[in-house]
Amino acid sequence: MQLITDYQNEFVAFMQEHLKERDPKNLYDPIHYILNVGGKRLRPTLTMLSADIFGTDYHKALYAALAVEIFHNFSLVHDDIMDAAPLRRGHPTVHTKWNLNTGILSGDTMLILAYQYFEQYEPNIFQELAKIFSKTAIEVCEGQQYDVDFEQQAQVSTDQYLKMIAYKTAVLVGAALQMGAIIAQTSEENKQKIYDFGLALGIAYQLQDDYLDTFGDASFGKKIGGDILQNKKTLLYLKALEKGTPEQKQELLTLYSTEPKSEEEKITRVTELFIATESHTFLRAQVETYTLKAFAILDTLDIPEEKKNILKEFGGSLMNRTI
């Protein structure tokens, strides 16, 4: 088995090899740009790792891994347009660096390019990959729409929020793993279980992201409090509203509906309310619940223990990160 960094390095080299300069430059340059401004390469790594774990040369999974990464970045380009976000990974967003129309067109092209990379596989594997990819792409769009809808909703339940992050984030983690299993042509049971593992892990991953946005370690360079400043209805916020006193609830609603005199003061006070209502404790418990659920599914996979342990270590490293 390869080290995770080995998969990542091989993937980046493969991606660079296949990102050819093409015309019109104002369509393709933004694609190259967004794919080269960093990112953890989590999803393509999982596709390669899954193929390896199920007994196939992981190099066979590189085209699917590239499709997954391009699709993920397509979703970010369009998310940034909808959020009017000026920065992504510390760099100007595509629509900011170019323009809105170019951002839309480049994103659309990325979605189509992702499908084209599946054409490298034989027909039966291509059909399976395209099926899970289409299902996942629709779910990601549904998740994004839920997120947009929640901005206008006065009330959002915990279950609604969990469904939104499952669709917007976790289904692609599950699909990335399942694609590796499809390429390895493992059993149908293994394909479903590795997807379910990824779905649970993806939910835990996003919940951990929500937690770190407020309670992460600023010394690592991560900007703390971005979700608070954007008035995002994360699980921290929703649970604080649910568990807080009438006074705490009203203060939180006011903080999220008025322009702050000081951004730092807003972050500090909202964080204090999260702690006072113990919503941060609830969120940490949810991260642990979904991580343990993922590992319980992993235990039922029909693969050797040492391969299960690789996935457990990788999952554990995601949940224990500080940035």
Give residue spans per PLM region.
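All-alpha prenyltransferase/terpene-synthase fold signal
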Residues: 1-323
